[in-house]
Amino acid sequence: SDAVADGEHAISGVVDS
């Protein structure tokens, strides 16, 4: 997680669906 306004995508390094 730790994504930014994109439905929690790979902004933290891992997809978090």
Curated annotation (Swiss-Prot):
CC terms in the record's Gene Ontology section: extracellular region
Domain of life of the native organism: Eukaryota
Q: Which residues cross the membrane?
A: none
Q: In which tissues is it expressed?
A: Expressed in skin granular glands.
**Signal peptide (from-to):** none
Q: Does the keyword Secreted apply?
A: yes
Q: Does Secreted count among this protein's keywords? A: yes
Q: Which UniProt keywords are given for this protein, alphabetically ordered?
A: Secreted
Enumerate the subcellular locations listed in this protein's record, separating them with semicolons: Secreted
Q: What is its main location?
A: secreted
Give a short account of what the protein does.
Answer: May act as an antimicrobial peptide.
Q: Which family does it belong to?
A: Belongs to the Frog skin active peptide (FSAP) family. Septenin subfamily.
Spell out the protein name for this chain.
Septenin 1
Give the organism's phylogenetic lineage. Answer: Eukaryota, Metazoa, Chordata, Craniata, Vertebrata
